[in-house]
A protein has these predicted regions:
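Alpha-helical cap/lid subdomain in secreted, periplasmic
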Residues: 361-503, 507-516
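A cross-domain feature marking catalytic cores of carbohydrate-active enzymes
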Residues: 15, 120, 347, 379, ...
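Serine-esterase "nucleophile elbow" of acetyl-processing enzymes
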Residues: 302-347, 363-375
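Acidic/histidine-rich helix-loop elements
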Residues: 317-325, 347-359, 385-394
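Short, surface-exposed alpha-helical segments at coil->helix boundaries
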Residues: 38, 327-331, 438-442
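Sequence-level preference for short, compositionally simple segments enriched
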Residues: 4-304
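Structural motif
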Residues: 10, 73, 307, 373-376, ...
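Conserved beta-strand segments of alpha/beta enzyme cores
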Residues: 30, 40, 342-344, 415, ...
């Protein structure tokens, strides 16, 4: 994973149970599990564990999953801390969200006391991860007030008992389920800084559990200026009729604690803590995602940058430095797209439309796809190969496999785009370019028309380019090297592109895409 990159790095986790502590200390990363309930990261660290000096490690080194990087998205997996009951082992954090602009979608977070902490790295933790601390004395960025780090949670399941969602950050929870363990306790414990107008906000969430009725409190203030608000949430009988609770011997509930539009068994707010705010409709309407976590950079986690996913073979794939100047045109495309587009090159050398599916690569791509994305599908070079793992029949199984990619994209609200394979550099003795892909390109053209899919006819466009350059002139587009550090004996490759050729093909794809609008 690069230390810094404009485009996110996507990490796919296969279904398994991973027993380890994870530290994500780099920016712009998407971590996606294959199946939420069966892709599990777990550990059993707890506050009472001893360090090398024989001292208790404390809460903030007990985590299973720590994120200090910014712009990190975690999706479709489970993160647990299996240390056990907090009355025996102390605090045991499952997720420690320390970065800024963190996004968590369809993630299960399961522990007991202190399941989810949203706050900066503490001094002990900084020895293990890059700290993201606010410099002392800083109160603004430019002309804007300082925005403390922000986290966004959507369709998550968060389970615990004592203060199990806590910390100082601004956080928005959308359609999340909060589940109280049998022990009972408090869903939240915010410690919002005095200068922050927002803390923990729960919108359209469900509060439930397995404790005795009335033994789950909405929260208590960890510090004097703590803020927690529940908007349009469903609360069942496990929730205490009192709602919030004072911190015994500490901070009391104030008007910074509020709720509005509650439904379910605890919809009646007449029995709530006397100091919590009774919100009006106008008060509640002022709480929006943009207002709460937008900040000085106007961040909105529901407005995402579209990604172009590339599925194909070696002519499209990325190559390491020791293969240079051989370059896939998908690799070159990343340099040419506008800043409002990301490119995720999933192409793999040697794959056909069939083998790419058989290796479950399409399954993972589908997990990543979102509405507004594009899926570029270019196969043919290896479908014509004779081996059983890759070969497809041009008129039967080839269009069937291509249809799987089209269906996967459309299921996720993404646009599928078919691309015929680029031409090989193969001229006859008379200098005439030869067709080398058989009937596969023609079948793809017919399929695009039948399924109503945009087609980029890279074969015809690249044939036109190679014909114009001629047998000798076209060598510059391919990996033809007499002497090169990576090819000391030289190489004459008429299929794979040089960096120059990759750029030309990527430019060609962009031109065809614009023409096909």
């Amino acid at each position: 994973v690069p230390m810094s990159s404009r485009m996110p790095t996507i990490l796919m986790l296969r279904m398994d149970e991973y027993h380890e502590k994870v530290i994500v200390n780099k920016d712009n990363i998407r971590i996606i599990g294959e199946a939420r309930d069966r892709t599990v990261i777990t550990n059993s660290g707890c506050a009472k564990d001893l360090d090398a000096d024989g001292k208790e490690k404390g809460t903030f080194l007990s985590y299973t999953f720590l994120v200090t990087g910014n712009n990190v998205e975690v999706e479709n997996l489970t993160i647990r801390n299996d240390a056990g009951d907090g009355s025996l082992v102390g605090q045991a954090v499952a997720v420690y969200a320390a970065g800024d602009r963190g996004v968590w979608r369809n993630v299960r977070m399961i522990a007991h006391q202190d399941t989810l902490f949203c706050g900066p790295t503490m001094p002990k933790v900084a020895r293990d991860a890059l700290p993201r601390l606010i410099p002392e004395g800083v109160t603004s960025v430019g002309d804007c007030p300082l925005t403390l780090n922000r986290q966004y949670f959507e369709d998550c399941y968060i389970q615990g008992d004592v203060d199990f969602i806590f910390g100082p950050y601004r956080c928005w929870f959308e359609r999340c389920t909060l589940f109280m363990n049998k022990r009972g306790g408090l869903y939240t414990a915010a410690n919002t800084p005095e200068q922050s107008p927002y803390g923990l906000v729960f919108h359209n969430c469900k509060l439930t559990g397995e404790c005795a009725p009335g033994q789950a409190y909405l929260g208590r203030p960890w510090r004097a200026f703590a803020r927690t608000v529940f908007l349009h949430c469903e609360m069942d009988e496990h929730v205490s009729p009192q709602g919030f609770q004072d911190w015994q011997g500490g901070a009391p509930v104030t008007e910074r604690y509020a709720e509005y539009g509650t439904t379910g068994a605890r919809a009646d707010q007449s029995t709530r803590h006397p100091k919590q705010k009774r919100m009006t409709e106008a008060d509640a309407a002022a709480y929006t995602i943009r207002e709460v976590i937008g900040g000085y950079d106007n961040w909105h986690p529901q407005h995402r940058t579209p990604t172009w996913f590339l599925c194909g073979d070696s002519t499209m794939a990325d190559y390491p430095a020791n293969a240079a100047p051989m370059t896939g045109w998908g690799q070159a495309l990343k340099r040419l797209v506008p800043e409002n587009v990301f490119v995720e090159n999933c192409a793999v050398c040697g794959r056909s439309s069939k083998s790419f599916v058989a290796e479950k690569r399409l399954n993972f791509v589908e997990l990543c796809l979102r509405k507004g994305d594009k899926l570029f599908i270019q196969f043919g070079h290896n479908d014509e190969k004779p081996d059983v793992d890759r070969a497809t029949d041009a008129h039967v199984t080839y269009p069937e496999y291509l249809g799987m990619y089209i269906d996967a994209a459309r299921r996720q609200g993404a646009e599928p785009i078919l691309l015929t394979p680029i031409a090989r550099r193969r001229f006859d003795e008379n200098g005439k370019l030869q067709h080398t892909h058989g009937e596969y390109p023609a079948v793809m053209r017919d399929l695009a028309d039948y399924r109503g899919v945009r087609l980029l006819d890279m074969e015809r466009a690249s044939e036109k380019l190679l014909t114009a350059l001629g047998s000798e002139g076209s060598k510059v587009l391919f990996n033809w090297q007499e002497h090169h550090l990576n090819y000391p004996d030289g190489v004459q490759d008429n299929t794979h592109l040089s960096d120059t050729g990759a750029v030309r093909m990527a430019q060609m794809a962009l031109t065809l895409l614009e023409e096909a609008q």
